[in-house]
Amino acid sequence: RSGDPQARVVIATATLALQTQLANKDIPTAVAACRKVTGRTVSHAVLKGRSNYVCLQRVRDGQGLEQEALVADPSEASGLGAEVVALRRWAEQEAEDDGLADRDDAPDHSPAAWAQVSVPVRECLGAQKCPFGEVCFVEESRRRARASQLVVTNHALLAIDAMHGGTALPEYDALVIDEAHELVARVTGAASVELGPTQVERVAKRCLPWLADQSGLEFLDAADTLQEGLDEAEVGRIPGGDPAVLAAVRSVRDAARQAVTGLAGGDADEVERNQAQAAAQEIFDIAERMAKLAEVDVIWVSESERFGRQLNCAPLSVAGLLRERVFADHAVVLTSATLKLGGDFRSIAASVGLDPSGADYRGLDVPSPFDYAKQGILYVAKQLAAPSRDGIAPDALAEIAELLWAAEGRTLGLFASQRAAEAAARYCRAEVPDRVILCQGDAHLPKLTAAFVDDPEASLFGTLSLWQGLDVPGDTCRLVVIDKIPFPRPDDPLMQARQQAVTQAGGNGFMAVAATHAGLLLAQGAGRLIRTLDDRGVVAVLDPRLVTARYGSYLRASLPDFWMTTDREVAIAALRRLGDSGRTGAEG
């Protein structure tokens, strides 16, 4: 509704951090510019998922907090208890000041402490039943969103809104999806569920006080049955359904159903009982979904040091959900610096449910302000052997050290695995001892990033979290090293299933899934080099397949238009010239 002062636009970005950046920096700048041109002030609000706000019912009436958390003087409490006390005091101050008790504004705390003052979506009593419904922070955030012309949210909440019939966001007239290259992954995450023995046991114990018959014990037993089934299964995808695992899932489903029935009929003010019932209902819904073995879902067994073995379930595709629930009724703009893969929008369009031919969308490629061909070099180490799954090769390590030496540090190393990053850090520390080599895992990432920025001659090595979002302009980063093309792991159950589905439908599963995934990450990683008009440097890809494989041209077309070479001496000479010019400029 062009020009309508009541029209509402929703902007959804990938992460909470980017949401905060938009709300605190970019949106106010845009609003000020709009006011200057039109004379109108555009109202705006931020909307996040429920668990990002304090729950006053948990703060004021909640049970189950550690006793030490109830100590009046935080100095007398320790660890978790002190954090909870601080959060509760802050929340009460937020309520008094008409704030929103947004987690981003909270005092320093651990996830465990935040869990004591917030509530999962399914366990929320709802504004009508909750004694604090009229002063609920979530309800207030929604009221502010409904009163605003511009609402800033995230991909996950957009997905929840689509899955639940438009209940999470206010009605809107247009939607802008920022960082749209991450949309499929974020929506997939929001639509995925997991089921583990510890999770089932925890919920069963919450239900026990109100279950007088055997149903409570059967719920506990179901957790043991699930553990046994997972222990017998192989880690990975179970496309046909492992009999022992499926039997265990059905056991959990049936026990959860009995618990839900047994907990029914409680009074509205029996908060803990109602929340226990909601938790049991969630376990039932997850187990029921998994037990169906629907063709639209992918189910697999995972194992981690923290959670042990778990059963995971994710949608095979989110294209239909996006096409029917997001794109069908609104004008939608998808924006990102890396939407063109292989030189066009077809791959991204297909992944979000649009016609790859362009019949139902218009693609606009806005030229970059950067002259990539003059500002950067793409060096592909064609002389190296193709990377293997056995770890980074000695020749590749030597290549990294030589490039880092030529760049005088100032290197961002992007690696396919933590093991490769650590191996490269050890090697370079030994071979180039006069340079500081920081490695992900040595400290918290924000601290490492700050150290990288503060010391212009330092280098930072890491994995996926460094590929996207790291913004280090200037001489701090003259060299970006990518050890291998970032294809998904061959044993990734979800990617494996999606690739197989495309192939069975007559398409090229590898190009549609694996190459698209790699192209997106390569574009993001290479994009770390040039951040301003004055930046210069080299992107070094130590994977010869970028120029020797048939899919190499597709991946190269996904990258910024750097001048390309396969000659190591050319890359090293360019890096040394940058060092010389930097010193000359400093002396001048």
Q: Where do the language-model regions lie?
A:
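A substrate-engagement module of RecA-like helicase motors
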Residues: 3-149, 239, 254-265, 495
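Conserved RecA-like ASCE P-loop NTPase motor core of nucleic-acid helicases/translocases
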Residues: 8-17, 333-335, 409-416, 540-542
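Signature of the SF2 helicase/ATPase Hel1-core->accessory helical subdomain module
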Residues: 17-20, 24-29, 121-150, 154-253, ...
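A contiguous, basic/glycine-rich beta-loop/short-helix subdomain that forms a polymer-engagement track
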Residues: 115-149, 164-166, 258-382, 391-398, ...
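Conserved interdomain linker/interface between the two RecA-like ATPase lobes of SF2 helicase motors
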Residues: 197-277, 374-405, 411
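Conserved RecA-like P-loop NTPase helicase motor core
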Residues: 369, 381-391, 442-547
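Conserved helicase motor "Helicase C" RecA-like lobe of SF1/SF2 P-loop NTPases
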Residues: 416-441
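N-terminal targeting/trafficking signals and adjacent low-complexity tails
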Residues: 540-588
